[in-house]
Structure formats: C-alpha cells, structure tokens
Design a protein with these regions (language model features):
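A short, Lys/Arg-rich alpha-helix, primarily the initiator
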Residues: 1-24
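Short, charged recognition helix plus adjacent turn
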Residues: 34, 56, 63-72
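Short, basic-rich loop-to-helix N-cap that marks the start of a DNA-contacting helix
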Residues: 40-56
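Short, basic interhelical loop/turn and adjoining N-cap
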Residues: 27-33
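Key DNA-contact positions within bacterial/archaeal DNA-binding proteins
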Residues: 19, 30, 63
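Residue-level detection of the helix-turn-helix DNA-binding "recognition helix"
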Residues: 12, 26, 37, 70
Length: 72
C-alpha cells in the first residue's frame, strides 16, 4: 500500500473531502491532491511532523501513515 493509498483510505474512512482533510491538517489542497493522485511524479513520503499531525487529528498510527506498518 502506497502513501497515496493510505491517505486516500483515511479520507474515505473519515467521509471527508480532500479540501476538508487539507484544512484540518494545515496544508494546501493542491498538496493533498499531489500526494493522493495517480501520477508517477507524486511525492512518496511526507515529513514526520505532518504524519504525526494526521495521526493525532484522525486517530491513525503515525508509523502506518509513514511506512504502511504499525509498531507493535
């Protein structure tokens, strides 16, 4: 599962728009579209501080957001 897949999963499970997601984590909606799009040129990583913010805001594991696996 890619970073784009994980972010799209969070957005889908929260039943919110990408605009709402971007507002709640404090980044531009364009950046969220870049991260979640299907382009081969999309970013494949995000800064740990953004992953932590997403984890706190939406209740997901920070490690899962960053790497696709949870720390046991």
């Amino acid at each position: 599962m890619t970073l784009a897949d994980r972010l799209n999963q969070i957005i889908d499970e929260q039943n919110i728009s990408k605009a709402e997601f971007s507002r709640r984590v404090g980044v531009s909606v364009n950046y969220i579209y870049q991260l979640t799009g299907s382009s081969e040129k999309r970013p494949t990583t995000i800064h740990q501080s953004l992953a932590k913010l997403i984890a706190l805001e939406f209740g997901y594991d920070e490690n899962w957001i960053l790497h696709g696996k949870k720390v046991e």
